[in-house]
A protein has these predicted regions:
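A membrane-topology feature that recognizes alpha-helical transmembrane segments
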Residues: 1-178
């Protein structure tokens, strides 16, 4: 396998796993362990097979970094644990060389999705005010979830964030090929 092929292998595999997670998230609003654990193991084994122990450990670190970034949002009540586990698996598969791009494109995709959902539901102004409220709340209360503006409240706008993760992977893959 050439370097070019192996470099595409990682984001392509991460994209495939993120798409599978997205299907579950859209249908059930959950990303089950039956998706995330095998994806995580695929990432470790893929890096071990193509790059050896050092690359596998680097992939493990990439998964941990992604997980820590998303853990902040989980602890603040902004996303579910399945999303955290999925981004950990995706980070492990993609590895350090794609880590920043996947996180950045995922954030952009998630922001676009959130604004789009707020527009479609006619709640853009309310959503923007809620974002201000969340910033204020977390500035004073740390990561403690807001009493009303969290994913446990059925009245809040919620979106299947695995779609944003898949979007981030697709965009990373696209720009890797382009």
């Amino acid at each position: 396998m050439t370097l070019f092929q192996s470099e595409l292998t990682y984001p392509a595999t991460a994209t495939a796993c993120a798409i599978v997670g997205s299907v579950f998230d859209v249908k059930s609003r959950r990303v089950p362990n039956v998706v995330t654990l095998p994806a995580f193991l695929i990432g470790l084994l893929l890096h071990l097979a193509l790059g050896g122990w050092r690359q596998m450990l680097s992939a493990l670190a990439a998964g941990a970094i992604c997980g820590l970034v998303f853990l902040v949002f989980y602890l603040a009540g902004g996303m579910g644990a399945g999303d955290v586990k999925l981004i950990m698996a995706v980070g492990c598969i993609a590895g350090m060389s794609h880590l920043f791009y996947i996180l950045a494109w995922t954030a952009i995709a998630g922001g676009v999705m959130a604004v789009g959902l707020a527009l479609v539901r006619g709640k853009l102004q309310e959503t923007l005010m809620n974002v201000g409220e969340l910033f204020s709340h977390h500035r004073h209360n740390g990561l403690q979830p807001h009493p009303d503006l969290n994913i446990s409240n059925a009245r809040t706008l919620r979106l299947p964030y695995a779609l944003a993760i898949a979007g981030g992977c697709i965009l990373t893959l696209y720009f890797q090929v382009a």
